[in-house]
Structures are given as structure tokens and as C-alpha cells.
Amino acid sequence: MNSFPNIAIDGPAGAGKSTVARLLSKELGFLYIDTGAMYRAVALKAIRKGVDLADQPGLSRLAAVTSVNLKTDAEGNLRVFLDGEDVTEEIRSPAVSKAVSLVARVPAVRERLVELQRAMASGGGVVMEGRDIGTVVLPDAEIKIFLTASPEERARRRREELAARGYIVDQHQMVNEITERDRIDTTRAAGPLVPAADAEIIDCSSMPVEKVVKMIVARVSAGRRE
């Protein structure tokens, strides 16, 4: 295995992909690429501009003139820039969470962002998380992980995340939103959410994030010894 393999982490909303990928990238000294944040940035712009989320040609035109950049700040945290503006916090709002799947299903939007993501991974040594990384964006990634958890557990995690930002959402409502997002993500024509054939599936419903990170680090270490 390459000493700086690309690591693809896929999974449904609320599975803990971002947390695992962030900790893993710090542990290995790799670049962390949050592809979901890139789609959220485009969704935020669509909301701001009043673009109908059912208007796929309109969303395609919007994506074509949108710049999304990812940078790591001095504390090692990922910052998301939309046309030069730091929108790291705003893209996590409930409104964007509802809109993002509708934006991400548009083929032209995905094609634009996939091109940017592949360019960032071309030198190896990235931890990239999303919903079609192992199947579409980086099908040749040396390590592929499909991280999942029960809808109830994912809803609980997402509620806690939103509460920390000042948004209070009912558990039943959140389970329904998670379930609907799963339906949209798994049935879309472009890059549907499915595990890659050679992905390791990890159910972290009752597994601490530190254990998940150790499992993946062990895989990287084992690969380097081969």
C-alpha cells in the first residue's frame, strides 16, 4: 500500500463520518476533505438566491458560477468558504440540512464538485468523507469505509449537534427527516448512497468514535507493512 493512501469514508446522515474523518486526518497527518460541506455550501447559495430546489437547470447554472474552498485554520479545524465568505457555521442550519439532498441529486452539481474533489486527492494522503466517495469520486482509494448507525441513534446525534448551535428539534421530527434523507440519497440517479463492493462496513450505533478511528488507523498501519 502507498504510504499516503487515500481513505474514503461513506455513510448516511448522522453516522459520524465528519467526526471520524476529522480525528483520523489529525492522527495520520492527512488532509481532511468534507465533501458534504461543499454540497451544503451550494445549497446555502441556492437558498440565499431564491433558486427553486426543484429547478435542476437553475441549480446547475448556480453551481457553475460558485466557488467552494476548504481550508484548515490555525487550530486545525476545517473552514468552508463560499465565494470567499466563511460559511462554516451557516451551512449546518436546519434549512440547509433540508435542502442539501435536493441540491446534491443534480448531476451537473455533482460533476462540478467531484472534479474539484478529485483534484484535491490527486497527490494521495487525504481522508475524504461523503456519500459516494468509494463508488464514484475515489473508486481507487486504498481504504474504503462505510460508516452507519440506526436512524434513532443518528437522529439523537444530529439533535445534539444542532442543540449546541442553538437549534432545538424534536426527536420524532429528526428521525423522519433522517429517514427521508436516506430515501433521497439511496434512490438518486447520480452517485446514490451505497457501500462500495470492497468497503468495510462499520455499524457504530454503540461504538465510541475513538474505537472507530483506531480500527481504521490499524488498517492503514497493516497496509503499510504489506
From Swiss-Prot:
Cellular-component GO terms for this entry: cytosol
Q: Which gene encodes it?
A: cmk
What is the recorded name of this protein?
Cytidylate kinase
Classification via HAMAP family: Cytidyl_kinase_type1 (MF_00238)
Q: Which reaction does it catalyse?
A: CMP + ATP = CDP + ADP; dCMP + ATP = dCDP + ADP
Quote the EC number. 2.7.4.25
Q: Which domain of life is it from?
A: Bacteria
What is stated as this protein's family in its record? Answer: Belongs to the cytidylate kinase family. Type 1 subfamily.
Q: Where does ATP bind?
A: 11-19
Which UniProt keywords are listed? Answer: ATP-binding, Cytoplasm, Kinase, Nucleotide-binding, Transferase
